[in-house]
């Protein structure tokens, strides 16, 4: 598995070696030893989540201010544009974002450590999105930053207005968001 640190170095893109022939393909989607070697520290996952969304659905930008979650994310059907925003005030990349296309075809995964907000928009007719988390969902600690915050200036690849949940429509401005030390 190839691991590439992105413009925010704590966010890592993983690309598996895929073995294919006329029967189909095989690849190792997760290897704890290789993953922790790339991250540089032990990581323990406690929950897997799976969602299905239609084209234009935008989920995010979500995070938990307590019980902060690291996430290893991938698309198992279709394609998404996946975004991580650094919310760690002490970080040299505080307030910056990175984004990557993840798809069933490219089989890429993105590691988003705790201390980041996360979101994605569906680019294909449908997408199924699978992610591992390092802590359990804690709705009382959940926060949301509005997807189109003018300070963050995320370059979402959108043709039309996204389809948002009520929670995501009510997201806070980055300037007003609870952030990490």
Curated annotation (Swiss-Prot):
The keyword Ubl conjugation does not apply. The record marks 137 as: Participates in a stacking interaction with the thymidine ring of dTDP-4-oxo-6-deoxyglucose. GO terms for cellular component: cytosol. Keywords: Carbohydrate metabolism, Isomerase, Lipopolysaccharide biosynthesis. It catalyses: dTDP-4-dehydro-6-deoxy-alpha-D-glucose = dTDP-4-dehydro-beta-L-rhamnose. Pathway: Carbohydrate biosynthesis; dTDP-L-rhamnose biosynthesis; Bacterial outer membrane biogenesis; lipopolysaccharide biosynthesis. Substrate binds at residues 23, 28, 47-49, 59, 71, 118, 142, 167. It is an enzyme of class 5 (isomerase). It holds the Pfam family dTDP_sugar_isom. The active site is at residues 62, 131. One of its GO terms (biological process) is lipopolysaccharide core region biosynthetic process. Catalyzes the epimerization of the C3' and C5'positions of dTDP-6-deoxy-D-xylo-4-hexulose, forming dTDP-6-deoxy-L-lyxo-4-hexulose. This is dTDP-4-dehydrorhamnose 3,5-epimerase. The gene is rmlC.
């Amino acid at each position: 598995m190839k691991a590439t640190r992105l413009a925010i170095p704590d966010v890592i893109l993983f690309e598996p070696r895929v073995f294919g022939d006329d029967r189909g393909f095989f690849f190792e989607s997760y290897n704890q030893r290789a993953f922790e070697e790339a991250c540089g520290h032990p990581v323990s996952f406690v929950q897997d989540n799976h969602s299905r969304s239609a084209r234009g659905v935008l989920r995010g930008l979500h995070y938990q201010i307590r019980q902060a979650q690291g996430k290893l994310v991938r698309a198992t059907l279709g394609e998404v544009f996946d975004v991580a925003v650094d919310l760690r005030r002490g970080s040299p990349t505080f307030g910056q974002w990175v984004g990557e296309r993840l798809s069933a075809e490219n089989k890429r995964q993105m590691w988003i450590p705790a201390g980041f907000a996360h979101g994605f928009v569906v680019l294909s007719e449908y997408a199924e999105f699978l992610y591992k988390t390092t802590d359990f969902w804690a709705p009382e600690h959940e926060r949301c930053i509005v997807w189109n915050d003018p300070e963050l200036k995320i370059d979402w690849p959108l043709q039309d207005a996204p389809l948002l949940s009520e929670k995501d429509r009510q997201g806070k401005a980055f300037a007003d968001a609870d952030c990490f030390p």
